[in-house]
A protein has these predicted regions:
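Conserved Walker B catalytic segment
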Residues: 66-99
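Short regulatory helix/loop adjacent to the ATP-binding pocket of P-loop NTPases
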Residues: 105-121, 136-138
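Structural recognition of the conserved hydrophobic beta-strand(s) that form the central parallel beta-sheet
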Residues: 61-62, 89, 97-103, 124
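Hydrophobic positions on the alpha1 helix immediately C-terminal to the Walker A/P-loop
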Residues: 5-9
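Short glycine-rich substrate-engagement loop in P-loop NTPases that contacts/grips substrate
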Residues: 25-56, 81
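Accessory nucleic acid-recognition modules appended to NTPase machines
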Residues: 163, 167-245
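Amphipathic alpha-helical segments of the small helical/lid subdomains adjacent to P-loop NTPase cores
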Residues: 122-160
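Post-Walker A helix-loop "phosphate-sensing" segment adjacent to the P-loop in P-loop NTPases
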Residues: 11-23
Length: 245
């Protein structure tokens, strides 16, 4: 996943490129030991204290940056997100490069494009392709292909044994991470309808999504009536969160 790419592969690349270890600042905000740095201003103070020599280049690696975004900041679009101000301040320093990871449903592409005003670039981390999945699976090719089609290419799937465990992992991931994050970010109160919408879309993979037809599907199946504008908004949220394309 993204944490491994940041703290292992990229970290090792920096060392191999001759960057001193003291010039690489790593902070995993999901680690309880770093809980204090979820306050953006304390995070800024810690980093600037580590950047001692203006003549040297420093690399700041922050994992799970969404932990430094408050719930009220997330819910209220008019509330300034302090973390973004901190990151912009770091980016203004000529000798500091910043690399961050974040939950895709909280740390949005639109934020990168608007808040960092040309200072930020995105790197999308996709699930494994089958050419990556197959050799790591240790299965016969036909069995690996069957599992890949059914369960997808999230790396953690390879660590789960048995279909029940894989299905449980995916269900928990969807409900506890994607769905919860989107509801918090966009102030969605009707979590059940969003979950049903996700199931409707999943049942028609590869088909064009028509908000009016989806609304009619809700109505005909005896679910809650959801208007076409609401469906359109929900689809937009799902796209921004990289749940659908």
């Amino acid at each position: 996943g993204k944490s491994y790419l940041l703290f292992n592969l990229f970290y090792d690349h920096l060392l191999a490129s001759g960057i001193p270890e003291d010039n690489i600042i790593c902070i995993a905000l999901d680690d309880v030991e770093n809980e204090a740095y979820r306050d953006p201003y304390r995070l800024y103070s810690y980093i600037t204290e580590r950047v001692q020599d203006n003549r040297e280049q420093y690399y700041v690696l922050i994992d799970e940056a969404q932990y430094a975004i408050g719930k009220e900041e997330m819910k209220n679009p008019d509330e300034p997100i302090r973390l973004y101000g901190v990151l912009n301040s770091l980016l203004r320093k000529n000798n500091v490069d910043v690399y961050i990871t974040g939950s895709n449903s909280k740390f949005l592409s639109s934020d990168v494009m608007t808040e960092f005003r040309g200072r930020g670039d995105e790197i999308h981390i996709s699930p494994l392709s089958f050419s990556e999945f197959y050799p790591a699976s240790g299965q016969e090719k036909s069995d690996a292909w069957r599992d890949y089609l059914y369960y997808g290419g999230l790396p953690h799937i390879l660590t789960e044994s048995g279909g029940e465990a894989k299905s449980r992992y995916l269900e928990n991931l969807n409900k506890e991470i994607y769905l919860r994050d989107m509801c918090e970010r966009y102030g969605i109160r009707d979590e059940e309808s969003m979950l049903i919408l996700m199931k409707v879309i999943a049942s028609a993979i590869g088909s064009l999504s028509n908000p009016q037809k989806i609304s009619d599907t809700f109505r005909s199946s005896g679910n809650k009536v959801i208007t076409m504008p609401t469906i359109s908004s929900y689809l937009k949220y799902l796209q921004e969160s990289f749940v659908v394309e």
